[in-house]
Structures are given as C-alpha cells and as structure tokens.
Amino acid sequence: MQTIRHTHLKLLPGILATLLLSACSMGKMVVQGTESVMDSSVETMNRETDLELAREAMPANLKLIEGMLIEDPGNTFMRLYAAEGFYGYAFGFIELEDRERASQFYRRCYDHALRALQDTGIQANPETSSPAELEATVGKAGAKSVAALFWTASCLGKWIDLNRDEPTGIIEISSAAIMMQRVLELDDDFYYGGAHMFFGVYYGGRAPMFGGDHALAEEHFRKAAAINQDRLLLVDLLQAEYLDRQRLDQAGFNKRLTRIVEAPDDLYPEMALINGITKQRAHHLLTLEDDWF
C-alpha cells in the first residue's frame, strides 16, 4: 500500500505539469482562434460613424487584447493590433485634451510594436543603435516585418512629437525615419500609404535649415492622396497642420481644412471612423488659424 502511495506521489508532479501545460496550450489556442474575429472587429470599428461609441468601446477592446497577450505573449498578430489600437485611441480621442496621457499611450504602442518587430527576427533597438547599425539591421527586413516596422516607427514618431523637449528626440526621429524608409522600399502603399504621410510630416514640419524639404513633403502627400483616391481626409489634415503651417501658407491651410469639414460623411465608408476623427481635428485646427498666421 505504501509503495502504491509513493508511486502516486511520484506521478503527481508530472500530472500537474501536464495539466499546466495543457492550460497554457489551451489559452494560446483560444487566442489564436480569435484572430479572424479580431480582423472583423477592426473592420467594423473602422466603419463606425459614431465617434462617442468608438471612444467608449476602444479601452475595453485594448484591455482584451492585452489580456490575450498574457496568454500568448509571442503572438505577433495580437501585438500589432495592440500597437494599432493604442495609436488610434491616443490620436483619435486623447491627444487634443491630454497630451501627457496620449504620450503614455504612444509609448505603450511603441513597446508592443517593437516586441512584434523583434519577434519577426529583426533585433532592432531604435533608441540605442547608431543610425548605421539600425539601417543595417532593418535592411534585412522582408515583407513579414513591414507591419511591425510601420507601427514601431509611427508610435516612436508620435511619442517624439509630444516630447520635443527630450534631448534624444533628434536622434530618435532619425531612427523612426530609417525604419519607415524600409517600409517605403518594401510596400509603399501599406496601411493607406502611411509611410508617405509620415515623410510628408517628417520633411514638411521643419524649416529647410533644420532638415526640412517642402517639395519632397508635398510629393509624399500627393502620393498618399493618390493611394487613397483622395478619400482619406487625414492626408489633407496632416498637410495643413505641418506643411502649410511651416510654409505660412494660410490660404492652403484654410482651403484644406475647409474641404475636410465640408466632405460628405460617406466619402470613404471603409474608413469612416478616421475620417470622422479627422473632421473633428480640422474644426479644432481652424480655431487656431489666427494664432498661427
């Protein structure tokens, strides 16, 4: 009897380990099984026309994604949705009213995106690598790393934009540009031509003596508009806010923002949410016109 009891005791750790492994595997299976649902959820959110409904829904969605990442921390797909979600929530609903909080969300966005990038095999660290080191590292990136490169660069760029007094900002924005340049090389129309919008802001938001290139910025905005058949209002918003303001082109600033405000709500049904957010921000920028010009 004692021998049987000892045998059971010896088996117990193995049984417990098996149960724990099964639980972990089950958690991962559940997460991976929701990936197609997440695709549909994001598509539905992008089509949302009620900004208040979207604002109230997004925090719960983000926490759900982060909960799934606890179950499956190596899930690159979910990492990228977390990055995209935090970026969208910060840009769409937080930045104009609380820049510090938005900055924290962009940082979380960056952390998720960088982890996703490293999980694709690109062991980059944009904040510590020299430009030459980073360029060599991202030069190895292929198509599977495009999304992670894009969101890492985008989130880092927005974090820098809200923390311009940070001494490392100039170095880090060049790191974001190196990553985004690789996105341009691999797939320049990825995420609605987002890389072109990035470089429109990058070259358009600075005076030429500080590295700006307004002609190049205008070309990038033109390409982004063409990719979206002039239906994504965000392109005009960014051109007005950064390039027109930097060039002191009040007429262009007003014309672009007025076009946004007057655009029909059904201009781009697949991207109704971002167009609605863009309209809201355009109204805000128009209130600043007299101060800026």
Each language-model region and where it sits:
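Conserved small-residue-rich beta-alpha loop and adjacent elements
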Residues: 191
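Extracytoplasmic and endomembrane cell-envelope/extracellular-matrix remodeling and assembly machinery
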Residues: 283, 287-293
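Residue-level signal for mature regions of secreted extracellular proteins and peptides
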Residues: 17-18
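Bacterial N-terminal signal peptides that target proteins for export
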Residues: 2-13
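Short coil/linker segments at helix-helix boundaries
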Residues: 36-64, 71-74, 85-185, 194-228, ...
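Short, conserved catalytic or interaction motifs in soluble domains
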Residues: 26
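Conserved catalytic/binding loops enriched for acidic/polar residues
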Residues: 82
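C-terminal motif of bacterial Sec signal peptides marking the signal peptidase cleavage site
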Residues: 22-23
